[in-house]
């Protein structure tokens, strides 16, 4: 059981106001579902917030090909400045020019005007795999 606001964030979908880094991070290793709302009146003394029961089913091998650190960094970067496009956030993180950032997104079939909150779970997986291949595998 968690606060209602946390439950909304954990279980939200891309394109919604509640979708953020916590949602995308959980999606890498689990699936979540809101089971039950619990109003504040069910407690004594009543708290100032409502609660919800969330079911999280972990599957740490959901995406075995994904480097979890690079995925987390990709997600964190995408939501670093919500008002900025993904291109601008990637430019700052990877120290690349605008064209290279746009090419990176195009390679992943992601709109160059996209923001972090519009990316699906599979978009984040694809983007993190491409970033790893292009920036972190040249050792």
Regions found by a protein language model. Name each.
Residues 124:
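Short, Lys/Arg-enriched alpha-helical microdomains
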Residues 1-116, 129-139:
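Class I S-adenosyl-L-methionine
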